[in-house]
């Protein structure tokens, strides 16, 4: 594809995106699937070649809901007001994006279904992740992704985690409100 674009003189006028809709477990956490909020499924590959773009990594938290706004921005089209997500074009250009997000929201609700994955929602920051399993259970998980990148040590309820848990729950409530997730009315976070 790259050779063709270069041959036709289109390479320097084309944004190339390689991505996926989700990651996948290959035995991690005893799972062979997707759906849970653990990093193996939550993180997705995203490679972007932008003519004149910055080479290297982007450390900011980007979601697949940002793809549309980014492509519209590149085309010079303003995103519709009702469209979720933000353009990460400034990040690709090596610029500082104004007021970039500090957290990501996740919600899996297809239960019961053939996969039998418990309903859960959560919030992830650059360092921490808080997950709440709900419906027929009420269970929480808290992970320090710097100290435990494999998410094997649940810190929820452990001494010394009270403040970060409180902050993450407040952020979780804020994100549920921001995305207008109806679950916030059924399962109120305390």
Segments the model singles out, each with a brief description of its role:
Residues 4, 8, 74, 158, ...:
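Structured segments of extracytoplasmic/periplasmic soluble domains
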Residues 38, 59, 79-81:
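Short, surface-exposed helix-loop/turn micro-motifs enriched in polar/charged residues
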Residues 55-58, 153:
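A generic structural signal for short coil/turn motifs at secondary-structure boundaries
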Residues 22-28, 49, 54, 65-68, ...:
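C-terminal cap/loop subdomain of S1 sulfatases and analogous C-terminal strand-loop tails that border
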Residues 2-53, 63:
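Histidine-centered active-site microenvironments of extracellular/periplasmic hydrolases
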Residues 6, 10, 93-96, 160:
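Residue-level signal for alpha-helix termini/capping positions
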Residues 1, 67, 168-171:
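Alpha-helical packing segments of well-folded alpha/beta enzyme cores
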Residues 5, 150-161:
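Active-site-proximal N-terminal segment of extracellular/periplasmic enzymes that hydrolyze or transfer
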